[in-house]
């Protein structure tokens, strides 16, 4: 989904996306600021459950605006279910968002509080659709698990991912990434917020059931700087580090954010 017609800096930063992707001003855009006093405690919600098979981890790819760890998604070996979801959602990739400083790199904020980075685990509705591409534009097509990251102690669970970044320094590079269980990156608390939203970068489809974990995970300043050392240029081009790739919070426009605590 990496296109040179959009980015995170002017002249084609987030405020300009609407020119090419009118849905950027839609009613269900993400991320949002989660105002905890306005969330609705919903007793019908269940804890979400993940079952990830480490053998489905496949490769790591520099997509120009971030990097993705991709998973084999031809069967239901790695799935997210329960919580607010009607069926099984299959893991296709995870990626991170970060900022040019340690203070602010998250996409979601909580009561206006910004976090250092954010992990997104992207899943598609395999109970109803036959591929990520088919599901990605459908209202019930995707589920993304969001985990806020706070600068502090180094997180040893991130090390395997960080160690692989040298192999995908420039845009378009990919390398094998095997035997990894991303549930190791999740916080221990089952608490979450959920709402209807969108992909946070073009094509910005309003197809996402968001599950944002209430508890954050740690990342050190040094680990964060490794994200920023990735390059958005192809090999041989002028080195342009990916300094930041976080879209600002979007208007809620009457949506309800439900809480499972």
From Swiss-Prot:
Changing residue 82 to G: In isozyme A2. Its EC number is 4.2.1.1, 4.2.1.69. Changing residue 84 to F: In isozyme A2. Changing residue 213 to Y: In homogeneous D isozyme. This is Carbonic anhydrase 1. Keywords: Acetylation, Cytoplasm, Lyase, Metal-binding, Zinc. One of its GO terms (molecular function) is cyanamide hydratase activity. The modification N-acetylalanine is found at residue 2. Changing residue 66 to G: In homogeneous D isozyme. It comes from the Eukaryota. GO terms for cellular component: cytoplasm. Its cofactor is Zn(2+). It holds the Pfam family Carb_anhydrase. Inhibited by acetazolamide. It is an enzyme of class 4 (lyase). Zn(2+) binds at residues 95, 97, 120. The active site is at 65 (proton donor/acceptor). It is found in: Cytoplasm. It comes from Equus caballus. It catalyses: hydrogencarbonate + H(+) = CO2 + H2O; urea = cyanamide + H2O. Catalyzes the reversible hydration of carbon dioxide. Can hydrate cyanamide to urea. Residues 4-261 form the Alpha-carbonic anhydrase domain. Substrate binds at residues 200-201. InterPro entries: CA_dom (IPR001148), CA_dom_sf (IPR036398), Carbonic_anhydrase_a-class (IPR023561), Carbonic_anhydrase_a-class_CS (IPR018338). Belongs to the alpha-carbonic anhydrase family.
């Amino acid at each position: 989904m990496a296109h040179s017609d959009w980015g995170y800096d002017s002249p084609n930063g987030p405020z300009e996306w609407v020119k090419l992707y009118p849905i950027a001003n839609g009613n269900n855009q993400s991320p949002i600021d989660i105002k905890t006093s306005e969330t609705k405690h919903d007793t019908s919600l269940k804890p979400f459950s993940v079952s990830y098979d480490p053998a489905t981890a496949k490769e790591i790819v520099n997509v120009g605006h971030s990097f993705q760890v991709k998973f084999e998604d031809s069967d239901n070996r790695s799935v997210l279910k329960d919580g607010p979801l009607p069926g099984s959602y299959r893991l296709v990739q995870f990626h991170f968002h970060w900022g040019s400083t340690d203070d602010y790199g998250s996409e979601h904020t909580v009561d206006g509080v910004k976090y250092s980075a954010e992990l997104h685990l992207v899943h598609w509705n395999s109970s109803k659709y036959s591929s990520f591409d088919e599901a990605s534009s459908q209202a019930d097509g995707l589920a993304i698990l969001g985990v806020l990251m706070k600068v502090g102690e180094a997180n040893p669970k991130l090390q395997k991912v960080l160690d692989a970044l040298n192999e995908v320094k420039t845009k378009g590079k990919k390398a094998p990434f095997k035997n990894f269980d991303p549930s190791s990156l999740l916080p221990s608390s089952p608490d979450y917020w959920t709402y209807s939203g969108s992909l946070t970068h073009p094509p910005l489809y309003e197809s996402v059931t968001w599950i944002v974990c209430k508890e954050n995970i740690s990342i050190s300043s040094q680990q964060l700087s490794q994200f920023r050392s990735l390059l958005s240029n192809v090999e041989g081009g002028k080195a342009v580090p990916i300094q930041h790739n976080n879209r600002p919070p979007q208007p809620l426009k009457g949506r309800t954010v439900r809480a499972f605590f």
